Every structure is written in C-alpha cells, then in structure tokens.
Swiss-Prot record:
Region (Disordered): 1726-1799
Protein name: Putative neural-cadherin 2
InterPro entries with a match to the protein in the record: Cadherin, Cadherin-like_dom, Cadherin-like_sf, Cadherin_CS, Cadherin_Y-type_LIR, Catenin-bd_sf, ConA-like_dom_sf, EGF-like_Ca-bd_dom
Pfam families (alphabetical): CADH_Y-type_LIR, Cadherin, EGF, Ig_Shg, Laminin_G_2
Organism classification: Eukaryota, Metazoa, Ecdysozoa, Arthropoda, Hexapoda
Subcellular location: Cell membrane
Example of a GO biological process term: cell-cell adhesion via plasma-membrane adhesion molecules
GO cellular component: catenin complex; plasma membrane
Domain notes: Three calcium ions are usually bound at the interface of each cadherin domain and rigidify the connections, imparting a strong curvature to the full-length ectodomain.
PROSITE patterns linked: CADHERIN_1, CADHERIN_2, EGF_1, EGF_2, EGF_3, LAM_G_DOMAIN
Positions with biased composition (Gly residues): 1733-1744, 1752-1763, 1775-1786
Length: 1799
C-alpha cells in the first residue's frame, strides 16, 4: 500500500511533513546507534561536474535493521560544495567545483537514529579538467616596422605570450593567426606568420604603406589554444603600423585638366587650379609636400613673355599677360610639374580654353531669302514658320535677336521673326494673307535684321552688332473661299403626277478662288433625297428622277451642295422646297379592318355597316362621298347569301354600305366567306376599288362528339424547357367553339409529367420532362349533349433539340399556307388521315441530303405576323447520322434552293424565300437602304401549332431586321465567348477587352483560328455564308494562279426565278479574264462591269490582292493597293498627279437600287448552280462559269475573316495551298519556320514571316522586349531606303498609360510624318504627306482600349494616302481603314534623324532634353519597319537594317512592378499580378460567386467549347473540362476529323499495283491448297488426346493429367501480325502509299447523351474493319497466358484460383460476359447472363456439353460447348464454327458480319 503522505511529499518536495512525521505503534526498544562499514570513504569527481550530480552513496546500518536513519554533513563542507540526501545517504554536488581553488574535501558525515548518532569521514578528491582558456598578457599588441623593408625576411617583429589557468595540466599551448595579411587557404600569399610554440610573429614580405595598393596599418588576431591545439582558445589583437618612406612620386590623376579664361582679360586673371596627389605620409617629414611649376609654357609672339604663371604652393594658374584673343588663339596647352620634398616629380597637362566675348558682328548667310506660302484660310493664322534663316558669327557666344524692319517694304506688318533654340531665325505670319487681294497676290518684299546682343535695347542700337537681309514671300492661292449661290432658298409647287424628267429649278454658284475660274459641281445631299426622286445636272438644274407620291410625302426639302474643285474641296448649301399637289390617284378602301361574325343557323339579318376612306386630298374634291355596291364579279354563292345596300346619309354624308345575310349558314360546311365590295370616290376622274370583307360564321354546339386521338411532337430546346402548353385534348367533334360546354378528365390518374386544365382541355408538359414517347388517356364530358366519358387518347413524343441544330438550321418562308395547314394530317376533302406537309417535306429533305428521315428535324413552324395573306416560316436541321454534327445552314438552304421546284411539287408548297432574311427585299423593311442585319433570337417560350389531330410544339424563333452592319456594330453587349466563335479547335478566353481566341492549331492563323487559304483545281467550288448587307462594304481577297481565266467568287441566284415571284436579281461576280480582273455587280436595277487593265497580267504565279468597295451608289475595285500607280510629286507645291488607271476602276450603280441583297451561298473558286438563261434576271453582262485554278486566301468582308477550312458544300477544293507549300519545302529554313512563323510563298519563291516576338531566318530567335521609363526614347538610323509610297509598321506593346507616342517616322523638318500613338487609352495613327501644308489624316480604334497591361500587336499598312490598322489580327473592332487615294502619296523619311520609338526628344540645353508624348512605364518589342527588324536597346543596339544611335532611360525585358508584394487579399481570393496592377480575384478555373464573397467552379461547358456534337463534361477548376468526341472526331475540343486525301496515280503506279495483286492472288491460292492439305493431315492424326500433347483438350482430371511434356507446343499460331499486311516478305514491296490523315473540322456541336454515346462507341469498335486483329484464325487464349498457373494442366487440381475473386467481372456489362464465364466459379450464374439464342455445337473432341449460349456461336476448341470450362477459343470470322469443328450461330449478330471479337 502506497502511503499518500509520501506521495504528497514527493509532489510538494516538502521536508517538513517528512521530518515531522511520527509513526505511532508498538515496537521493540532499540537504543543502539547506527554504524558505518568503514571509518573512511574516499572518491573522485571532475571539477566541471553538474550540480545535483551524485558523488557517493554512504549507508549506515542498525542492529535492528531499521531504515529510519537520517544523514547530514557536519564538517569539512567548505563553501557548501556538497550535500547529502538525509534519508538515503546520497552525497551530491551542491555548488560549483574548482580544482584550482580547492582540489580536496574531507567531509564529516553523521548518521542519526532515535537521537543516537555515529560518524564517518568522506574524502572527495576533485579531478582537474581543462576549463580555463589561455590568457594573453596583453589584449592588444602593437609594433611598428618600416614599409618596403625586404631585408632579412622573414623577420621577427614581436612575441606574444599566453598562460593557462589549469595549473596542474601539461603546458602545451599552440598559437595561430587570422585576419588581414593571413591567407590560410594559400599560405604563400600570407604577409605574416607565427611560431606555433613560441608565439614569435614574423613578417614574411615587404609591405607597402601607400595607396592605392598599400595600407598604413595591418590588424589581425592571434589565437592561443591549450591541450596542444585540442583545448580551449584565447585571443588578442595585433596591430602593425608601417613607417613611411618617400617612395611615391606626385601624380595628376586626370592627366589632362581643363580650364577657361575669358578673352580680353587683364594679367593675373585666375584660370584654373592644378592639384597633384602624393600617396606618401603627409605627416612624415616632407615626403608629401608638393611644389608646382610650369615646365612647358606658351610664349606671346610679340613680346616673347610667357602667357601663364602658377602659384607654387596652391597650383593656381593665372594669366601672365593681358588681352587674350579667342578669335586668334582659341585654346592653349601647358605642362605643369609637381615635386615633393624628396625630389620626386609628376607631370600634368593643363588645357586652357579662351572663352568668347561678343566682339564680332553677325552676318546673314544670304542677302535675299525667297519663300512661297499659302494664303491663310480666313482669320486662322498658322503657327508653323514659313521660313528659317541662318546667320554666321565668328563669336562663339551669341544671343541672336531677329525682327522684321518696320516699314521696310510691302508686307512688313504681316510677318514677324522669332529666334529658334539652335540660333536660327524663323519667319511667321501674324496677319491674314489673302490671295484674292490684288495687292497681295503679287507677293511681299521687306527687310529683316539680326543683332547678336540678344535684345533690342542698347545693344540693338550698336550698328556694329546688327546685320540686314531681304525677304521675298510669294503667295499661293488656296481653296479658302466657299462657292456662293445666287439664290440659296427656292420653293416650287408641282402636281404629284408630273412626268419624270421635268426640270424644276436652276441653281447657280460661283467661286472666287483661282481668279473666279474655279469649277463648281453640284450634288444633292443624299439624306434629303432618300428615294432618289430628284436629280441635279452638272449645271445645277434640278429635275424629277422618279415618280412622286403626295400620299407618301407632300413636301420635300432638298439640300443642294455646290462643290468647288479645290483641294480640299469646299462646299456651300442651298435648299429647294418642293410642294407636291394632289391628284386623284388612289382608290378608296375600308375605313377600318372589319371582322364581323354571323352565327350559324340564323336566318337573314343585318351584319354591319361599312364606311370608307381615301388618302387623296378631300379639300380638292378627291375624297367622299363614296358609293358602295357588291362587286358584279362576285360568285353566285356570295350573291345568293349576302346583299350590299348603299346608304348615302351614313358616316356624316360620306355614305356607308349595309351588309346583310340572305340565308342561314352552317359553320361545319364553311367557316368564313369573303364578300367583294366595290367602292367609288368623288374625284375627277373618279377612282374605284374593291375591298374584301371577311364574314366569319360563328359556331354553335350542334354536333355530338366522338372518340378521338391526337399526336403531339415536342422539341425541347437543350432539354431545358419550362412548363409548356402543348395543345388541347382532342375528341372528334365538328364544333370548334364549344369548349365551355366540355369538361376534361384523366382516364385513370394524372401523369406526373403532365398537367391538364379540366375546363379548357389544355395539356401542359411540366418542366424537366425527358425525351421519349408518352401515351396519355383522357375522358371528355359534354354538358350540352349529355355525353359522358368519351375517350380521348394523346400520344406525346418529346425530342431534344440542341443549340447546334438551331444555329445551323436552314429556313424557308411559305406563302398562302398557315402553320396549322402545314402540320395538319386530316384531309377534310378526302375525309381521311394522310401525311402532313411537314412530314412530306421532312422525307423529301432526307432524300435530297442522302440521310435518314430520323436525322431531319423540322423544329419550328411559325405564322408570320402582320402579313395580309398567310406566311409561314419553317426552320429545319439535318445531319448525316446520329451523333454526327449538323449540316451547315448554308448547305441546307442551298439544297432547298436548288430543288425548290421539286420540293414544291412533291410536298405541295409555295416557297417564297429560302434562308429567311428580313433584309432581303430592298425598301420594304424599316432600314430602307441603310445597313441591315437579319437577326434570329430565341424566344423564351415555345411556339405551339395545334390542330385537331396533331400538334407541333417547336422552338420559337423571332426574326427581325436590325439597321446595323453586323461586322461593324461594336455597341452590342453580348460580346463574349458564347457569341465569339473560335474556329478549328481554338480556345476562347475572356479578357477585359472581350473574348480572345488562343491556342490555334498550326496552319489556322486567322484572328479566330480561321483557315485563311483554300486551293482549287479548275473544276471545283466551295460554299460559304453569303455576304452581309451593309451600307458601306469592303470585300478583299488574295489569289495566286498561272491560269488566265477563272471565276474567283460568285454570290447570287443559283436557280432561275419562278414566273410569278418577285425577282431578286442582286449578285456579285469576280473573275479573271485573260489575266485581268473583272467585276460584275448588280443591285437589282442593272449590272455594272468594272475592269482593270493592269500593267502585267495577274496570272504570274504571285499573290495578288483585290479590294472591292461599294455603297449605295458607287463601286470601286483596287488591285494590289495601287502600288503600280504612276505618282508625280513636285517640291514647288504643284498639286500631285496620281494615275491609277492600271490599278483602280470606279463605277456607279444604275438607279435606283441601293443595296446588295443576298441570301444564297457565297461560292469561291467556281460555280455550282442550275444552268439557266442569265437574261431571266435582266443581267446585262454574263460571267464565266469556268472554275478557278489556283489558291485563294484572306477572304475578308467588312473586317470579318471567312473561315475557309470547312465549306458547307464543296467539290475539288482543298484547305491550304499545296502549290505554294511545295515551294516552302524546297529550302531548309522555309521548311522549318512553322513553329514560330509562317512560310509565305508564291509559286516561285518562299520566305518565313515570323510571328510577333520572333526573328531570324528560321524564326527561331526570340525578341527581347524593352521597358520605357519616364523621359525615354530610342532614335534609329536606318541602313535601308524606305519606300516612299508604302510604309509597313508592326510592333508589340503593353501599357497601362493613357497616352504616349509609340513610333514615328518623318522627314528632316518633321513636316511629313507618320505617327503611331496612344490617346486616352486608344490607338491612333496620324500622318501628313504634304510638306507644304498640314493635311493630316487620322485613324483611331475607338471601340477597344489597349491600356490593359496585356501584350498587343499592332500592324499599320500605308499605301499612299490609304492606311489600314490591324490590332491583334485585325477583325471587327480591332480594325479600321482609310482607303482613298487623294492628294499627296509619298512619305519622305529621314534615315538619320526621322525615326523614333517611345517619343521624340527635343533638346532644351547642352545636356538636357525633353521627350514629347513620352511613352513611359510601358514596353515595346519586335519593331518592324517595312518588314525589317529594328533593334531595341539595351538588349540589342543594331541589326543589319538599322542602328539605335541614341537611347535614354530604358530597361531590358518587361517586368511587372510586383503590385501584389504588399497586398493581402481576403479569403478565398488570390492576388493576381495583372502587370503593374493587381486584382483580388478567384484562381484559374473559378469565378466569383453571385454574392461576390466567394469563389465557385467556372463551368467552361457554358462556353460550348466542344465541337461537332461532342459532349462537354465540366471538371475541377485545374482540369477545366473534357470533351467526349463522337465517332470520327478527336482533339481537345473534338475539332479534328480524319479525311483521306485522294491520290492521283500514274500509269506506272497502277501497273505496280496490278502486279502486286497478281502476286497476292497466287499466294492466296497456295495458302488455300496448303491449308486444305494440312486439315486433312490433322484429321488423320487425331485419334485421341493422348496421341499428341499439342492437342488443346487433355484429361486434366486424371491422376497426373497434364504432366506430359508440353514443350512441343507449336508456337506458330501465336505469331499474330499487328497489321493486315501479314504474309511473306515479298508482299511488302507492293504496299500502297500511305494516306495521311488530314485535320478537318465540322460545325460546332452540342451536348450528347453520355450513355448513348458510350454504347455507340462500343458498336463502332466492334464494326471497325481497319483495326487489328484482322480476319483470320487466331489463338486468343493459350496455355498459361495471364494466369498464375504454369499450364492449363494445373487448373483442375490447383487451389490458387480459389483465392481469386473474379465476380466483379459480371458487373462489366454483357460484352464481358464471356470473360466472366471463364473466371467466375459459379458457371450457371455467368451463363444465365449471356444471350440465350446462341446455337449449339458438336465437335470431334470430348467437350463437356453440346449446348452453347455464347455470343460467339456454338463450338469450342475441341468440344461442343461455346465456352468449355476455363478454356476459351474465339473464331473471328467465318461460318461460326470453332476450331473444334462444331457449328453455331451468333447470339448478337450473324457470324458472317462479325469482323472481330473484343473481350
């Protein structure tokens, strides 16, 4: 039992409880004292022993063996060094021990029990340990030696001594040094050393005290370590001072010193101070005391006296003579000597420059200056100087002041002189100049003056310092006067039937310029003449051009422009007001849209009164009163059923018609009647018109209902539809207005996916209803007839329709048919059900597309609103097979157009428009002749078409015309990755400036990964989407060919027009004819032909570019940017000449059509259309149908690049340009530039065009960007001659600044320039090509900001006065252009002074400059001028094309300023470095939650990245997403498809193939004969399994079965070839050329059903004929393969299989049932899962059974069972018999169709 008090004592360390504890009990009395075994105990302990360390345990004993003995030390414990535990006798260390203080202790130890005690002696000897480090006698040792003393080395300089406090230990101290002059790694370099035992220190080398290599003092440390270098360490400092000797001569560090002295100064003038340096000790005698003297002075020629003197002590140089003359001697050089106290000398040179005083007069470099200047434009005074004058002055320091001498000549008051920073003077205009003033037209002559005193004060009056010169200013006439009309406002009144061509008025304007001889042209402002009803002649006569209509517009305000022939032209405006008077030219009509209803079964009664209206002017008697009557031509049925009575007094005496019925009507016979009513007005002559009144017969519930059934087809858009009404439950009842009399019920119970309105019978499909077929049953009650429980059945079929199907849908508009008629299946005439027009159209379309009808979806049928007669819009989609991408809309529309007549005939339709386009009919829409885009928007709710027996619930599509040019509309908000399609597998990423396509595959180099090039062979074509309608359009393309004739492009009708339809004859055709470009274009009012007779034909095997421009009136075609134009420019200000006949053609569209309306496929390279007479469309010119042979690239319409990779339909057309690719492969560097560049080739040569950021012949050298800091710039000197007509600039940049100049080129005086700059965060390019006046042109990318910190690539292309801007590929908002050749065309570039990057430096002083438009805190990279790389310091200062002659404040690379370094973002956001800016946002792959407080996974599948019908699966943020591709597609986004290219084989190749086929047939015959012989041999040998161990069936159950020799196994069956070309080696020579896959792409896809997709993929693998194993007999499982058993013989008796659980194989699906049957021990369970219709089999071997349920058919290896035990044999092809011989049939498919079996 543990005593708790003892525990407490231990825990509290309390001796009180222990000493006071008294054990109470009864015991024997013991009064004997305790005793010790010995009288003396002796032990040892180290002096460094730890406190509490046990020294010795001494135990006393008691005669009664008592343990109650207490111990204490009573003597000898000096310093309480030890203590004893009073109960145990353990002596321990209580205080630190020190051997050197007390080496021995003799303790007296007392033991006490019951007040009886005894004593003993304990002797403790303290052992010495090394606990004292050596101690030096001094802390610092100092000594002095003389520098450079090399005598008696090494020399002892002092001795150090250290002692060890451990007195009784061996004295064995070792010394060593560290510090200055000590090199432990290489002792040979040390300056000092020490004797390790004596402490003597030696100097080893002579020491130098003096600078620059010496030192006056050496300090190092000496260490002493006892125990022979193994013990403790002590240290001391050593200081060695060096005594100086005079061993250094004085010297002048700079060698040459520069000073100044003013000319004409007095003698003794201070010039400069020369200071020499002596490194000797200045405190050591006179070693460093210097005395200066002039050793070589200059002598004054006249007197022979020295010119300069020097003060010996200070070195101050003074003039010794007076009056130095700078103009005589501008500088002097003297030699000065400095000598120290020891006589050592040093020499320096003083270069003295005489500073100038203004003591010489100025002089103009010309006596007369002549210049020519434009007259000023009104009161505007230009700031630019018109003349720069220069002055010569022998003085160096001058401050020139210029001025015009007042009253010195005519014009002196109109000009002023100003001083320039470089000392020249400029003449500026200060008052308006007017050429039209006869006095001024002859020019001006006056004097100017200059003085070099800098002011007009007293110095200016000093005639000695003033010079004069004459100035002659010639004045040029400019177009500064606007034309002036004689009459600015004219008003005329005419009747609306005035004949076309009638002249209304004559305008006349004059212009004061050119002496009144300026020509004036006249023009009507188009916005005031929208319908082009008026025209104006060259002489100003305004006439009627098109008929007028007062009812449309009764007053016209026509603005007339008078335009002079100046440059730039000036205009004046006048107004013609045309008042149109009325004539009676309109027939009256109904006053309103009457819709009367007449109940059925009612006798004759009044229906309603009808009034009339007339748009003609009633005040002129051209309106009412009206008269009415029934149209005499009305049918007899109408005449018998209705009457029309005229009431003169009705409608306020205007007259009305009273309509009445004459008999009762039956609605079930006819639902409505159209009554024609003739209305006549009161005009002279009167106008008569016929209006039709539709009377609807109202329904009465007078028929009993019969059971009915109805089928409903629902298209569920992306499976996301909400609750959707799908129509009314149908019963067969002729009445159709009797819904209030009926009640509708479910027959049994309500279906969970549908909801019924019992009052209306409307059935609603609930949200989330999946695709499939639903059979629904209802009952209907009719209270009117008392009918109950009339059955009504409803079949609902739900189909999913994808976004891809809607996007790629074709469309057509049907006339005179309603949406109900299109889907109706009941024929009331034949009184029977028949296929609807929808189904017939669907079948016909499937036939035309060569696809199954199930692959055609007619998913939207809508009745167009607002039409006077029924118009129905139909949208449809189709594909070649399930899981395949949908056909493109262009293909669907084209096929329907091509077969329109056939479809109309077979289906019974009237197709009025294919590819529904609300912009197609010019002038009928809201946009008029403006830009127009037909936009299709997805409605929020489905569109339901419900008729009695059928209903279609389709996708609602709202089509509207928007008056914008789609490509140039930058205001829409839905600019994101969902609308910004990236082609060909490119990946769309969202940026702050909108979506951007990245990771484009190689060869797809368009801005959105478009394929830019396509080739044609002369007999092909390719279809693409039609050209969009824009008010101003620009179409450009490039082509290359060696064939002189061929159709390059055509967009227009592809079928002849129908006789009764409105003909839309618009088309555009571009072709080569005899090597020259020819354009035909027709807006519908006449064909315009443009031809360009180029200097050389364009079939020269070189790429050529054609640009076609058109607006509402004008068309222009430009060839190769007009680089071949003849340009003539003079320096005297003569207007330039520009002859563009060989590069440009212009024309006007015949009136009056104003827009190119197209909705047919755009065809490139040829023509695919029906042959028809082109005169059917009234075309005045015919174009060739011969195909183009060559390549076409970069087809761009209004800055949108066409993707040429996958046309909707094509023939004999291929992506890329194989003809030029062959040229690229001919040279090594062009064949290897694909990784970071593009090979650009013609048919004769190729070169590498490097991607931005790369350079070098093979585009394999990365460029290095440069950071431009504040006040930074680079000035270049070019080593090539820039083209004056063309300028190409490309560079990369990144910035966050609002402004700055990126690059500029200019002439010497910066009057002609081209500047790329940043303004308010947007790029702009401005240029001026006229050195005489400012005619600046400006291009800006206003729709996109570029100061987002991202890298951008800008490309500027200037051709003459035309310019193009392309940012990051240049599409849509990243493109702008000015494509007009007007005025000057040349830009002169100064190669040395005119090329800058980062801003232009203006020097404000000798060493100070200021950078204008400083491009700072930004980066530039890869600057190319005319395609040539310019260097960017500091990484590169020069290339073969130029040098960076000046550069300031630049930094290599483009690092960020680490904005996240001091930012802590709140969880869960991360700080993202956006380059010089940061953002706390979510990590990659995540987006901010709706409450902006957290991050959630970004669903990349919403961007529809998976193409071609692939399924998108959203993954974790790091992995983003994954696409499951349909059959035949691959790639990250399923964008690629393998398409075998057709090979053209020569006769030699065909012969080789024929020979190979013969050899193969012979070998096949030999193989057959050999096989038959071998089979016969096998049958003879097979007498039992014991005969040959190579038999595959053995009696494994026998004792020792399977233990025979198995090494004779025939290995031949195991030699399975991996390709189909197995056989003898000779066959390899007959292999066909390899057909490499071609990457192609089909249209974007949408999500698929994953389960269905996996099933389809498995079926495809089963049917793949091209993948191994191939048709042959193979051993798929052989003995011992993949098993832990060594042979099949061990399977029956072994136990290893018992430990293996293969039951999981049963869960792998039916395709793995055979594998499960092999390994699962429960054979019955496995067999029960196999198909049940497999055939049985029989064989020669003793198989375990005859029946088989294997999907492989009956027959096993040697047995009748399909799967005998654990043995498997597979027959891949043939009759289904296994190797054992048993016959069988497949449970899955007929065996002859099986290509292979996959387990």
């Amino acid at each position: 039992m543990v005593d708790p008090l003892k525990i407490f004592w231990v825990l509290t360390n309390s001796t009180y409880l222990v000493t006071k504890f008294v054990r109470i009990g009864i015991a024997d009395k013991n009064d004997s004292p305790p005793y010790f075994d010995r009288f003396l105990y002796e032990t040892e302990i180290d002096e460094n022993a730890d406190l509490q360390s046990t020294v010795l345990t001494v135990n006393a004993k008691d005669h009664n063996e008592s343990t109650n003995i207490r111990y204490q030390i009573t003597g000898g414990n000096i310093g309480n060094a030890f203590a004893v535990q009073n109960t145990t006798g353990v002596i321990y260390v209580a205080s630190p021990l020190d051997y050197e203080t007390r080496p021995r202790y003799e303790l007296r130890l007392e033991a006490t029990r019951n007040r009886k005690n005894n004593y003993t002696t304990v002797v403790i000897n303290v052992r010495d340990v090394n606990d004292n480090p050596p101690v030096f006698d001094r802390q610092t040792y100092r000594t002095q030696i003389t520098e450079e003393d090399d005598r008696n080395l090494p020399k002892r300089i002092l001795q150090v001594t250290a002692t060890d406090g451990d007195v009784d230990r061996p004295i064995n101290i070792v010394y060593f040094l560290t510090g200055q002059g000590i090199d432990p790694d290489n002792p040979a370099n040390s300056k000092f050393d020490i004797n390790r035992t004596t402490g003597d220190i030696f100097v080893l080398k002579p020491l130098d005290r003096d600078q620059p290599n010496g030192r006056p003092q050496w300090r190092f440390t000496v260490f002493a370590q006892d125990e022979g270098g193994e013990g403790l360490v002590g240290y001391a400092d050593i200081q060695v001072n060096l005594k100086d000797i005079n061993d250094n001569a004085p010297q002048f560090p700079q060698g040459i010193y520069f000073g100044n002295v003013t000319e004409n100064g007095t003698a003794g003038s201070s010039v400069m101070t020369m200071s020499a340096v002596d490194y000797d000790d200045p405190n050591e005698s006179t070693n460093a005391k210097l005395i200066y003297s002039i050793e070589k002075n200059v002598i004054e020629e006249e007197t022979g006296a020295p010119i300069f003197e020097i003060e010996p002590e200070t070195g101050l140089i003074k003039t010794a003579v007076c009056c130095l003359d700078r103009e005589r001697t501008p500088d002097y050089s003297i030699q000065v000597v400095a000598m120290d106290g020891g006589g050592l000398k040093g020499t320096g040179t003083a270069s003295i420059r005489v500073k100038d005083l203004n003591d010489m007069p100025p002089q103009f470099t010309k006596d007369e200056w002549v210049t020519e200047v434009d007259e000023t434009n009104g009161t505007y005074i230009p700031e630019t100087p018109i003349l720069t004058v220069t002055v010569q002055d022998e003085d160096e320091t001058n401050t020139f002041q210029y001025k015009v001498v007042p009253n010195s000549g005519f014009g002196a008051d109109k000009f002023a002189m100003v001083r320039n920073g470089d000392g020249t003077g400029s003449l500026k205009i200060i008052q308006p100049l007017d050429y039209e003033d006869p006095l001024q037209s002859s020019g001006f002559r006056f004097r100017i003056q200059v003085n070099d005193k800098g002011d007009d004060g007293p110095g200016g009056s000093d005639k000695y310092h003033v010079a004069y010169s004459w100035v002659v200013v010639k004045l040029r006439d400019i177009n500064d006067n606007v034309p002036k009309f004689d009459r600015e406002h004219i008003e005329v009144s005419i009747y609306e039937d005035t004949k076309v061509g009638t002249i209304l008025e004559q305008f006349k304007a004059t212009d004061a310029d050119q002496g009144g001889h300026s020509k004036v042209a006249y023009k009507i402002v188009r916005s005031t003449n929208r319908k082009r009803q008026f025209a104006i002649s060259d002489r100003g006569a305004v006439s009627i051009q098109r008929p007028l209509d007062r009812e449309t517009q009764d007053r016209h305000h026509i603005q007339i422009l008078a335009i002079d022939d100046g440059s730039p032209a000036r205009t004046a405006t006048a107004t013609l007001t045309v008042i149109v008077k009325d004539v009676n030219d309109n027939a009256p009509t109904f006053a309103q849209d009457y819709k009367p209803t007449l109940p059925e079964n009612v006798s004759g009664k009044k229906i309603l009164e009808v009034a009339a209206k007339d748009p003609d002017d009633r005040l002129r008697g051209n309106g009412g009163p009206f008269t009415f009557r029934l149209d005499p031509l009305a049918s007899d049925e109408i005449k018998a059923g209705f009457k029309v009575e005229y009431d003169r007094r009705g409608d306020n005496e205007n007259g009305v018609a009273i309509i009445s019925s004459l008999r009762p009507f039956d609605r079930e016979a006819q639902k409505s009647y159209a009554i024609p009513i003739e209305i006549k007005d009161n005009g002279a002559p009167a106008m008569t018109g016929t209006s039709t009144l539709t009377v609807t017969i109202g329904d009465v519930n007078d028929n009993k209902m019969q059971p009915g059934s109805k089928s409903v087809l629902v298209y569920n858009y992306q499976g996301q539809s909400q609750d959707t009404p799908i129509g009314r439950v149908y019963v067969n009842d002729p009445d159709d207005w009797d819904v209030p009399d009926k009640k509708y019920y479910w027959e049994v119970q309500e279906h969970q996916r549908f909801k019924l309105d019992t009052d209306t019978g409307i059935l609603t499909m609930r949200a989330g209803t999946r695709r499939g077929r639903y059979q629904l049953r209802f009952k209907v009650y009719d209270r009117e007839h008392g009918q109950e429980d009339i059955p009504a059945n409803l079949s609902v079929t739900v189909r999913d329709i994808t976004a891809e199907a809607v996007q790629q849908a074709g469309s057509m508009r049907l006339s005179h048919i309603t949406d109900e008629d299109f889907v109706r299946t009941w024929n009331p005439v034949k009184n029977q059900v028949e296929p609807s027009k929808l189904e017939r159209f669907r079948n016909k379309l499937a036939e035309l597309l060569y696809t199954d009808r199930d692959n055609v979806d007619v998913f939207s049928v809508q009745l167009k609103e607002g039409s006077p007669y029924p118009l129905t819009d139909v949208h449809f989609a189709a594909r070649s097979a399930t899981q395949q991408p949908y056909f493109k809309a262009v293909r669907l529309n084209g096929v329907v157009q091509m077969h329109r007549e056939e479809i109309e005939k077979d289906v019974g339709l009237n197709i009025t428009m294919v590819n529904i386009n609300e912009c197609l009919h010019e002038g009928k829409g809201k946009c008029g002749s403006n830009s127009c885009t037909s936009k299709v928007e997805l409605g929020k709710k489905p569109y339901t078409v419900s008729v009695n027996r059928t209903a279609l619930v389709g996708v609602r599509l709202d089509i509207s015309a928007q008056c914008v040019c789609r490509a140039r509309n930058f205001t829409h908000q839905d600019h994101n990755c969902r609308t910004h399609l990236c082609y060909n597998g490119g990946r769309c990423v969202e940026t702050r400036n909108g979506p951007k396509c990245v990771a484009c595959p190689v060869g797809y180099n368009g801005p959105r990964c478009q394929q830019s090039t396509r080739s044609f062979r002369g007999n092909g074509w390719a279809w693409y989407p039609p050209l969009q309608l824009c008010q101003e359009s620009h179409l450009s393309l490039e082509f290359i060919t060696r064939v002189a004739d061929g159709l390059i492009l055509y967009n227009g009708p592809i079928v002849p027009p129908k006789p009764e339809e409105t003909v839309i004859s618009d088309f555009i055709a571009l072709e080569l004819e005899q090597g020259y470009p020819r354009l035909l274009i027709d807006f519908g009012s006449g064909t315009l032909e443009l031809r360009v007779k180029t200097k050389k034909t364009l079939d020269d095997g070189v790429w050529h570019r054609l640009d076609i421009f058109w607006d509402t009136e004008n068309v222009r075609m430009v060839v190769d940017f007009c680089r071949t134009a003849l340009v003539s420019e003079m320096e005297d200000g003569t207007p330039p000449e520009f002859d563009d006949n060989a590069c440009q053609a212009r024309g006007q569209i015949p009136p009056f059509a104003e827009s190119l309306n197209l909705n047919q496929p755009l065809q490139l390279g040829g023509l695919y259309r029906q042959h028809f007479d082109q005169t059917l469309y009234n075309w005045q010119y015919a174009f060739s149908s011969k195909g183009f042979d060559g390549c076409i690239r970069n087809v761009i319409h209004n800055s949108e690049h066409y993707d040429l990779a996958f046309p909707a339909l094509a023939r004999n057309s291929f992506p890329a340009c194989p003809q030029t690719d062959e040229v690229c492969l001919k040279t090594e560097h062009t064949a290897r530039c694909w990784e970071h560049g593009n090979c650009v080739a013609s048919l004769v040569q190729a070169k590498c065009h490097c991607q931005p950021g790369w350079m070098g012949p093979g585009c394999n050298v990365p460029t290095i960007p440069t950071t431009f800091k504040a006040q930074s710039y680079v000035k270049f000197a070019l080593s090539f001659e820039p083209d004056r007509f063309s300028t190409q600039l490309q560079l990369r940049f990144r910035t966050r600044e609002q402004g700055g100049e990126l690059f500029r080129v200019s002439d010497q005086h910066h009057r002609e320039y081209a500047i790329l700059e940043l303004r308010r965060g947007h790029l702009q390019f401005r240029y001026n090509l006229n050195s005489m006046r400012n005619e600046e042109q400006l291009l800006t990318l206003t729709a996109i900001a570029v100061n987002d910190g991202q890298w951008h690539v800008i490309r500027i292309s200037r051709y003459g006065s035309a310019a193009l801007m392309e940012l990051d590929g240049g599409e849509s908002r990243r493109y702008n252009e000015s494509f007009h050749f007007t005025g000057h065309q040349w830009l002169t570039i100064d190669k040395q002074e005119g090329v800058y990057a980062g801003g232009k430096a203006e020097y404000t002083g000798i060493k100070t400059f200021e950078v204008q438009s400083d491009f700072q805190r930004s980066c530039l990279d890869d600057i190319r001028l005319d395609g040539k790389h310019l260097p960017l310091p500091p990484a590169m200062n020069g290339t073969q094309w130029g040098q960076a002659t000046m550069a300031r404040n630049l930094e290599r690379n483009c690092p960020s300023n680490r904005p996240c370094s001091n930012v802590i973002c709140p969880d869960p956001f991360d700080c993202v470095d956006l380059w010089n800016e940061y953002e706390c946002t979510c990590s990659e792959g995540r987006i901010m939650s709706s409450d902006t407080k957290g991050c959630v996974d970004r669903n990349e599948c919403l961007d529809l990245p998976c193409l071609n019908g692939a399924t998108c699966i959203n993954l974790e943020p790091r992995l983003r997403y994954r696409c499951i591709c349909p059959e035949g597609y691959w790639g990250e986004n399923c964008e690629l498809v393998q398409e075998g290219q057709r090979l053209k084989l020569s006769m030699g190749a065909l012969g080789a193939i024929f020979v190979c086929l013969i050899i193969i047939l012979i070998l096949a015959l030999i193989f057959v004969l050999y096989s038959r012989k071998r089979k016969t041999t096998k049958k003879k040998k097979r007498s039992g399994p014991e005969k040959d161990v190579r038999e595959t069936v053995i009696s494994y159950e026998d004792e020792g079965g399977g233990e025979d020799d198995m090494t004779a196994f025939d290995i031949t069956p195991l030699q399975i070839p991996i390709s189909a070309q197995g056989g003898p080696p000779d066959i390899a020579a007959c292999k066909m050329p390899i057909i490499y896959p071609v990457m192609t792409l089909l249209p974007p896809g949408q999500e698929l059903n994953v389960a269905y997709l996996m099933e389809e993929r498995k079926q495809r693998i089963d049917k793949d004929n091209n993948a191994p194993p191939f048709d042959d007999l193979r051993n798929f499982t052989f003995e011992g393969s993949g098993s832990i058993a060594e042979s099949l013989s061990s399977l029956a008796s072994g136990t290893d299989d018992e430990n293996q659980d293969f039951n999981y194989l049963q869960n792998w699906g039916p395709r793995f049932n055979a594998l499960a049957a092999m390994y699962v021990h429960d054979k019955a369970k496995a067999s029960s899962q196999l198909p049940s219709d497999g055939g049985g089999g029989s064989g020669d071997g003793p198989g375990p059974g005859a029946s088989s349920s294997s999907p492989l058919g009956g027959g096993g290896t040697g047995g009748g069972s399909g799967i005998p035990g654990n043995v498997l044999a597979v027959v891949a092809t043939g009759s289904g018999a296994g190797p054992g011989g048993g016959g069988g049939s497949s449970g899955l498919m007929p065996l002859p169709e099986v290509d292979k079996v996959v387990l």
